[in-house]
Regions:
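Flexible "cap/lid" loop of the alpha/beta hydrolase fold
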Residues: 113-124, 128-155
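Catalytic active-site module of serine/aspartate enzymes centered on a nucleophile-bearing elbow/loop
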Residues: 231-252
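Short beta-strand/loop motif that positions the catalytic acidic residue
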Residues: 197, 203-205
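Conserved acidic catalytic loop of the alpha/beta-hydrolase fold
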Residues: 85-102
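Short beta-strand element of the alpha/beta-hydrolase
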Residues: 31-38
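Conserved loop-alpha-helix segment in the C-terminal half of the alpha/beta-hydrolase fold
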Residues: 207-232
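Conserved alpha/beta-hydrolase
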Residues: 55-74
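The serine-hydrolase catalytic nucleophile loop
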Residues: 40-52
Length: 252
């Protein structure tokens, strides 16, 4: 298990429940922490963050997957491969493949949406962090999700809000069809389900970040949650020392 600060770690692969290859990196030893990336992104987004560096320095084992449809993982072109919480099932399978009995999960942005659903399905998660997220994802008809799902559909008419996302996705050679299906079938976790979570959860967000709703409302919906507000906007807060400090303190 190599340790690499600020550079992309070596990718490994496992075959998920439906035959899709899922890429991941696995660095360090100690208590396992899974980092779950956001939309139009992949696991390498964590490489330049303070939190990944400090987790490794403090002796944690850091596991970083590329969610299906992203990065080096499989990008199937049929819609059926993105339904029924497929991404969550991939992560459950990865944890089993790596023989993790208890572990920690840190999600950011859309990664927090995936992590929230995972929390409701897997008792092996000891602690978790939901970063850059409010309560809006609990609505199955969330207009922001639908807006971006439609934007990534073939031949879609773009709005001022979605033009930038499409341009960025093209610039990083992301798979537009996969991104469409990922948004269309994004997991939904109800407020009731959040209220049933028994493990400890940290909600952390930048003070300029309301892109996905009010993070304090998410904190209030999860009984055993803590809340940390740090400086920063949605795209920058998770890279900062303040984000890392909040998480490292929570994990002690």
């Amino acid at each position: 298990m190599q340790i690499s600060f600020g550079v992309q770690a070596q990718k490994e692969f496992f075959t998920s429940f439906d035959g899709i290859e899922i890429a991941y990196s696995d660095e360090g030893k100690g208590k396992a922490v899974v980092l779950v990336h956001g939309f139009i992104n992949n696991g390498s987004s964590w490489d330049a963050t303070v939190v990944k560096k400090e987790l490794l320095q403090k002796g944690y084992r850091v596991i970083v997957p590329d969610l299906r449809g992203n990065g080096s993982s499989g990008k199937p072109q049929e819609e059926k491969f993105y339904t029924d919480d497929a991404e969550v099932r991939d992560l459950q399978g990865l944890a089993s493949y790596l023989k993790l009995k208890k572990f920690i999960v840190v999600g950011y942005s859309r990664g927090s949406i995936i992590t929230a659903k995972w929390l409701t399905l897997d008792g092996r998660i000891k602690k978790s962090v939901l970063g850059g997220m409010g309560l809006d994802f609990t609505n199955p008809e969330w207009n922001r999700r639908i807006l971006f799902a439609n934007a990534f559909a073939e031949g879609a008419e773009l709005t001022e809000e979605t033009k930038g996302a499409i341009a960025y996705a093209i610039s990083v050679q992301a798979d537009l069809k996969a991104l469409h299906y990922l948004q269309k079938h994004q997991p939904v976790t109800s407020v009731f389900e959040l209220g049933q979570i028994k493990s400890k959860v940290l909600i952390v967000a930048g003070d300029e970040d309301l892109e996905n709703g009010n993070p304090e409302a998410l904190h209030k919906a999860i009984p055993k949650s803590a809340f940390a507000l740090i400086k920063g906007n949605h795209n920058e807060a998770y890279k900062t020392a303040s984000f890392s400090k909040a998480i490292i303190s929570f994990l002690k």
